[in-house]
Amino acid sequence: MVINLWYNKQMKEWRWSLTETGIMTQHTGGQEELRDAMNDVANTVEYILDNALKEE
């Protein structure tokens, strides 16, 4: 799992991408507030992990 986080000045928002390299899936998002962007990333990781556990 690879997570990238950056600030886009033109859009005035924190952007993020999360790539699951093993299955070549990507999730992306953006928020004006850093804390909200980080929460989105955390929620996405938890969602991925919850679904991975259900598949086992």
Where are the regions that the model predicts?
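Non-catalytic effector/regulatory segments
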Residues: 1, 17-19, 52
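Short N-terminal "domain-start" leader segments
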Residues: 1-15, 46-47
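Short, mixed-charge low-complexity intrinsically disordered segments
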Residues: 47-56
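Acidic, low-complexity, intrinsically disordered interaction modules
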Residues: 11, 15-27
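Intrinsic disorder/low-complexity detector
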Residues: 6, 10, 29, 42, ...
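A short, exposed loop/beta-hairpin motif centered on an aromatic-Gly-Thr core
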Residues: 22-39, 44
